[in-house]
Amino acid sequence: MPTKLWPLAAALLLAPLALGQDERPNFLLIIADDVTYNDLPLYGGPNISTPNIDGLASEGLTFNRAYLSMAMCNPCRTELYTGLYPFRNGSSWNHSAARTGTLSVVDHLGRLGYRVGLAGKKHVLPDESFRFESVAGITNHREPTPVPEFDTSDIEEFMGREGDEPFFLVTAFHEAHAPWTVGSPDKFDLAKLALPDNLADTPRTRGQFATYLAEIEVWDWEVGRVLDALDASGQADRTVVLLTSEQGSAFPGNKWTNWNTGVRTALVVRWPGRIAAGARTDALVQYADVLPTLVSAAGAEAGDQFDGHSFLPVLRGQTADHREYVYLMHNNVPEGPPYPIRSIVDARWHYIRNLQPEALYFEKHMMGAFRTNWFWETWLAASGPSAQAAINRRAVMLANRFMRRPAEQLYDVAADPYQMRNLIGDLGLADVRDRLATALGRWMQSQGDPGASLDSEAMWRNAREGRHLPPRSGP
């Protein structure tokens, strides 16, 4: 996909930020649930249509290389709302809790005079750290329905409320989290679907992939409804809109992993009059950078209270780069037995360290009694008609790739987005491996991350009860 990067000269076209009380922008964050970034047409996805997302991107800046530290809902949202990496904020597992006293976007923007609200999925704890004003309208649908109920009147009221206070509003949708129950999957010709390279081509996989794609199209419709509500509120011209797809989908190799299609996310930012329309950037950013960016855009100094750093200069077109590395981790408890992972990404390479490679990876929602998807067993079937032999062999290969992993993995991000070719044994890349491994170890040490011992039932339960391991004292 061609990349149109910001020219540095664009900075000359953008006025410097010097905000008075009535010039502070509003912020509207639109977030999906378990949408793999490159299933979206904006990132090359070939199967669906998303006119509202594409329209938003045509009016703003698309980040080609945005990431989140953990490919699970609770940890990535805690990172997003705190500007801190998982070990320092405390949410180092799914269904866990931030450290007692952790400050969030509610505190940081609230102190700057913002009303801070959330409509839809919250999934962050403790409540004392995330005291969003609750805004009605977005509900979770567990029964099949082509079009979900979605009343935007309270969302519009929150954005258009009279007064001098600017707003920050999260609209957090449940699409496309499994089980995939909304939308119209029957519209897809299963035989013509282009399956991603990391999915086994079985009939059940194709059928469930269609139900997942249908939910993404519903999310796009919901995005359009939210943007219509913003227009109706009269606040569109002074509102920064951020759209992100969260972690990857609940298919093997995406969510619950440190592979590219798990930890990489869509990110689009629209800021009328401040961002050139239809631009793209290869700047490396991650969720920990978002809150410092909002604080800076609101006219305050982000300082050193965050792990992340403001990418406001990227938005302004003043630089094409942001950070040298993004930092990633995974603790498998409570989604399965321990399988700790740490990894690091730079402009080209992705290095993964599996801390217990002797273990068998298992995730209960895809592979066990809690599963809501029914394709996994078809990946394990090695027998069948001769015409299916090659498909079956590939399915078993992909299942083994998912369950059994080496101690180290190294991938060329641009050449291998589905990360099917592990280059760790390439002697010509030994210097790359050593550089990334050293940087990863330095990051873990700076956070106070003990590594494999963190991925345990006891550690997870202690964290949920507010008894975390102590972090290091500063970023």
What are these regions (language model features)?
Residues 1-8:
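Bacterial N-terminal signal peptides that target proteins for export
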Residues 7, 18-19:
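Post-cleavage N-terminal segment of exported redox proteins
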Residues 8-14:
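Hydrophobic helical h-region of N-terminal Sec-dependent signal peptides
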Residues 12, 19-409, 417-442, 451-452, ...:
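Formylglycine-dependent sulfatase
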Residues 456-460:
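A glycine-rich phosphate-binding loop feature that marks nucleotide/adenosyl-phosphate handling sites
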